[in-house]
């Protein structure tokens, strides 16, 4: 589950729980799984009414597949598993007032990147799995070609550009290409797109920041 969260992989995790009437009594095999995974799921549900199941599953699949994708956990007590839903209806729409995923770029940050790009002499783009999940490979390639900017990728970003493309330098990080790492380290502007600034990709942060 934690790996799916880190890699932005949509996942629905269904777990079993003790009888709902026994929740909180520390009975045999009771585990606060929703609390245990709180830091590495997008959302978690503890179903206490069998009639909530259609809505919960509709919401869970929506949350897992929108915004930055990731895992959602649904914990179902044994009595709810054995209960019968009367007048089953799977909702057509989702109404989540508190869930508003970011789907548009930050205008001020984009303008800042453009200004920095105009000044840069050795810019480079590091693309991650977010580009693939957003199906934005074509837009990335067009942007790189229009501005003549080399592209490197994280492991999750392999496939953002054809390996034979003259602007694609390969994968960076601990297991990446030497020349790709060197190109990123010696750039004067690093544009991260759909990638986390993690140690697996940015293996030598001191070299990168030295030229920025």
Language-model-derived ranges and their functions:
Residues 1-212:
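N-terminal alpha/beta PP-like core and its mobile active-site loop of ThDP/TPP-dependent enzymes
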